[in-house]
Amino acid sequence: MYLNGRITRIFRLKKNSFRQQNFLYPLLLQEYIYSLAHYNSFNSLISYEPVEIIGYDNKSSLVLVKRLITRMYQQKSLISSLNDSNQNEFWGHKNSFSSHFSSQMVSEGFGVILEIPFLSRLVSSLEEKRIPKYQNLRSIHSIFPFLEDKLSHLNYVSDLLIPHPIHLEILVQILQCWIKDVPSLHLLRLFFHEYHNLNSLITSKKAIDVFSKRKKRFFWFLHNSYVYECEYLFLFLRKQSSYLRSISSGVFLERTQFYGKIEYLIIRCCNSFQKILWVLKDTFIHYVRYQGKAILASERTLILMNGWKFHLVNFWQSYFHFWVQPYRIHINQLPNYSFSFLGYFSSVRKNPLVVRNQMLENSFLINTLNNKLDTIVPAISLIGSLSKAQFCTVLGHLISKPIWTDLSDSAIRDRFCRICRNLCRYHTGSSKKQVLDRIKYILRLSCARTLARKHKSTVRTFMRRLGSGFLKEFFLEEEQSPSLIFLQKISFILHGLHRERIWYLDIIRINDLVDHS
């Protein structure tokens, strides 16, 4: 901890010296950058597999960083790395240190460096506007109470997929308005060409492997930068089409080249731009997004929703200069449609409600319908995620986890229990709990099979020896875990009992096994 605090203080001092001119390339040759990147990457890691910690000297040598950048700029080394990956000494997999260092530490360090101009503007913006720092505002579950309050009164919903693939040069141009450092941009282009599959890594719904052990800081930075550009077009139209002040857009950073692009578009369609804004004027529209998928909902008519779709597609095509497939935006009526978002199938259901009306001495009953947001867990998708992680088959049949048999019994139980608690805790907002009981059963028996395989015994014999209290922590109530929660009673009747929908407001990262979309 002392070493990390010292590195952080040095990093802040260096960052202030480079903040004015945004000249970031010399930071690549600073040794503490890679130590800081390694420390942050390790601490933010949520993994179910054992993590191999490599020493500081093996990953943060300044001489190796210089040699690495020099080799990257050598044309022969670049060509050989692209043509013959088996004989490549730099990017190849035969040299474990080179592959780990080049693909992990340099990209992580480069991501830390690229965040400097963004972080300085964000901190100054928050200080000027005096925005309070509430940790629960970062919760993923905080989206669902918002949807419960808003979607029940709306008519149409649009499923949006962020446009992809995108040309690599467009990513460089996106960052060019923030970073004026030409050597850093050249090095960024070189990184893009080395990661030849970057298109599928940063924008598609399979952006990062669901069960990957490490999520690259560098790729998250590129993903967020690109999504920011896509959303800024929407926020610009939303702000121009409504005279109401948008609170959500207050935290966005100031742009330098975006308005020049908009002026160019206004000149091209100056006669029809005001008509477009008049068509898009809608003060009752709501927008939420997670990763590459977004939800756009409104209480207006289908014509207005088609107008939003048409103009968003055209603005994306004009701004990014590539074809945006219109089929990526689906418009549906909320009462007749279920959409997948953040690991749930959500839909608006008609809930019958009987109200007793009292007028003087007479009373009578009124039957009415009330809209309720119904969120359920997709059993097939969740079991498919468990099968990819090799906890069961695609059909839900139990299997053991042979790669964990070298661990101790307590370590195996802790891993299974942690996965089970995380999944059940995240899905406590479901109106149907039968799927969660099935997930508990699969993980409990998979743990028993793994332990029985380790001790070379049968599952029945092993569980009989341990007794009925085996793995009772699998069935602990989710309400016992200490956290900030949001309770809401729902009218769904399951097995004759009223169930509570629970949203946890301290979940700031979606679990790997939850992100099965």
From Swiss-Prot:
It is found in: Plastid, Chloroplast. Keywords: Chloroplast, mRNA processing, Plastid, RNA-binding, tRNA processing. It comes from the Eukaryota. One of its GO terms (biological process) is mRNA processing. GO terms for cellular component: chloroplast. The keyword Zinc does not apply. The keyword tRNA processing applies. Transmembrane segments: none annotated. Pfam families: Intron_maturas2, MatK_N. One of its GO terms (molecular function) is RNA binding. InterPro entries: Domain_X, Maturase_MatK, Maturase_MatK_N. Its main location: plastid. Usually encoded in the trnK tRNA gene intron. Probably assists in splicing its own and other chloroplast group II introns. Belongs to the intron maturase 2 family. MatK subfamily. This is Maturase K. The lineage of its organism: Eukaryota, Viridiplantae, Streptophyta, Embryophyta, Tracheophyta. The gene is matK.
